[in-house]
């Protein structure tokens, strides 16, 4: 192979770990590999990562020296929170004078519900900051150690202005052999309770994430790649693995961010809705003016000082099963063939479809018994799915990832047609209409929330089931649509192309030029520490006058780029087509009115 420089993206999923190699100059996808995710290996998922890297490099003759960027997306932080697999946290609250009692109350955050029945357990000690001696701090830390805490959080009112006391607690805790962090390291916003809560969630993730980060980093080094490993963030950017060790909370929900990054960087979507459809669910997000839309994250219904992409997930996808009640289709999903442990009818050999008969089952013990499967002479039963309906109706191209055995699907749906007295096509359209009405409602919400123009946006589909969802949805809603190139790997591609990103917020009423200069300086320090080349960094400043928030958003690449690979030249014919589509007309009705340059 030639010596072109490449970027590697790795996406660690529940079942498979995907790896892609992308040409650094052209964005061409050079290679793709899929290996089983190694949850139970001695090195955990890191073992699957090294297998994916070695396979993709060896098979394609790529030298590790030619890899100039490597990053991976992880669901570990999200999974740890959902499963309650987190460390017990000790909080050292501080305050003085009239603020002392309020500070004591606001740093006592209690046990934080992470998911139904799963909690982050916190212990609390309070010190009057007016007498913050080393002895007082050590006494508080020792008391917390007796309560079996693994991590210390130091939290004080106004530490965003002066973090000295928090830094003292952190330093003494580290000397005691504990991992420690402070509220000022997580957020620059006032609001002691929310800052403490966010710091506690972050701290609870640190021990587990440090262990995984070390194994993953060593795995990458073992492959011979010299560039530092970057990790996907929840806002669509990446950060260095050293920063992950300090702020693992920023990787929470990052699994949803990778696909959006792919739509933004690879598909160059500037205004539209991105839908990443898998087997069980579809993740839906908005992109406006070439920017991802973000929101404040929550845990247990309480706000965190953490921004993540506004990604809305719906239990409709290629594997969604068909619900039958009263002799007709009543619903689609949320259960999928995967959850029911059934094969898709459309991915089944025709010779298995002998003597088909519809049966109604409960995919899980607590589900209703109205999900349709087709039982066959071989003793097996197969799920009727949305993918089957889309294939039968001709919405899935023959070379698509979701393309299947249409003949088998027609046999299965034919059994349902016999039971309901409808035709196969009528049933398939009923199922698609029910499903796409649900998806369409979320698309409409995003269009309204972000003031997008339906005539100018495009629906872009990614994921293995993109062609099952997006073409029918676009047709139904009258909105332009397309399937992303390499759609099944769009998340992994997004990881490989993502920029380093940092965001900083401060409470400032009527910010002065000096306030803006200071936040620009500070975020530049943070983003370069996170791995960005200073020469590539772009900083935007936002002022929220209603909330008195001064916000800086910085993005940058890990290497100096010789050209803007995101720059896209649109021909006059393409411009005419875009305008014609927006105005629901043809290109021969569009004329150039003026030109410049």
Where are these regions (language model features)?
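N-terminally biased helix-coil "hinge/interface" segments that flank
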Residues: 2-597
């Amino acid at each position: 192979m030639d010596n072109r420089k490449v970027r590697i993206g790795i996406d660690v999923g529940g079942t498979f770990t995907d790896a892609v190699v992308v040409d650094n100059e052209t964005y061409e996808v050079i290679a793709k590999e899929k290996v089983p995710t190694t949850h139970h290996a001695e090195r955990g998922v890191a073992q699957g990562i090294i297998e994916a890297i070695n396979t993709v490099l060896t098979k394609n003759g790529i030298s590790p020296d030619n890899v100039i960027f490597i990053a991976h997306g992880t669901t570990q932080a999200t999974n740890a929170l959902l499963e309650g697999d987190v460390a017990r946290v000790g909080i050292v609250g501080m305050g003085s004078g009239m603020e002392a009692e309020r500070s004591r109350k606001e740093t006592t955050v209690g046990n934080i519900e992470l998911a139904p029945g799963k909690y982050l357990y916190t212990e609390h000690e309070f010190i009057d900051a007016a007498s913050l001696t080393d002895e007082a701090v050590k006494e508080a830390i020792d008391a917390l150690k007796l309560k079996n805490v693994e991590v210390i959080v130091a939290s004080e009112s106004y530490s965003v202005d002066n973090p000295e006391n928090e830094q003292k607690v952190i330093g003494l805790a580290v000397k005691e052999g504990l991992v420690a962090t402070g509220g000022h390291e997580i957020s620059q916003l006032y609001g002691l309770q929310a800052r403490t809560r966010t710091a506690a969630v972050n701290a609870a993730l640190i021990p587990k994430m440090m262990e995984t980060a070390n194994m993953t980093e060593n795995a990458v080094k073992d492959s011979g790649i010299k560039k530092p490993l970057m990790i996907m963030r929840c806002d669509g950017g990446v950060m260095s693995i050293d920063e992950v060790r300090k702020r693992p909370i920023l990787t929470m929900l990052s699994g949803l961010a990778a696909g959006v990054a792919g739509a933004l960087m690879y598909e160059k979507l500037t205004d539209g809705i991105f839908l990443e459809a898998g087997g069980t669910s579809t993740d839906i997000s908005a992109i406006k003016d070439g920017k991802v839309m973000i929101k404040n994250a929550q845990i247990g219904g309480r706000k965190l000082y953490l921004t993540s992409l506004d990604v809305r997930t719906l239990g409709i996808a290629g594997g969604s099963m068909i619900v039958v009640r009263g002799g007709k289709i009543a619903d689609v999903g949320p259960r999928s063939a995967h959850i029911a442990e059934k094969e898709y009818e459309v991915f089944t050999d025709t010779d298995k479809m002998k003597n088909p008969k519809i049966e109604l089952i409960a995919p899980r013990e607590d589900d209703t018994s109205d999900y349709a499967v087709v039982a066959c002479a071989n003793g097996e039963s197969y799920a009727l799915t949305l993918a089957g309906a889309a294939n039968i109706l001709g919405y899935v191209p023959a070379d698509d990832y979701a393309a299947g055995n249409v003949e088998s699907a027609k046999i299965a749906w034919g059994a349902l047609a016999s039971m309901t007295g409808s035709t196969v096509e009528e049933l398939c359209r009923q199922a698609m209409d029910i499903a796409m009405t649900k998806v369409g409602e979320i698309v409409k919400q995003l269009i309204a929330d972000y003031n997008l123009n339906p005539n100018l946006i495009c629906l872009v589909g990614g994921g293995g089931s993109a062609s099952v969802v997006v073409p029918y949805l676009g047709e139904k809603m009258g909105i332009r649509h397309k399937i992303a190139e390499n759609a099944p790997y769009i998340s992994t591609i997004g990881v490989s192309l993502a920029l380093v990103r940092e965001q900083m917020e401060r409470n400032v009423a009527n910010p002065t030029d000096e306030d803006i200069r200071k936040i620009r300086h500070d975020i530049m320090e943070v983003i370069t520490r996170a791995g960005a080349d200073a020469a590539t960094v772009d900083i935007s400043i936002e002022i929220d006058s209603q909330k008195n928030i001064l916000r800086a958003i910085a993005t940058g690449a890990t290497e100096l780029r010789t050209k803007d690979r995101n720059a896209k030249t649109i021909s006059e014919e393409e411009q005419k087509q875009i305008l014609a589509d927006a105005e629901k007309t043809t290109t021969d009705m569009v004329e150039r009115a003026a030109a410049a340059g």
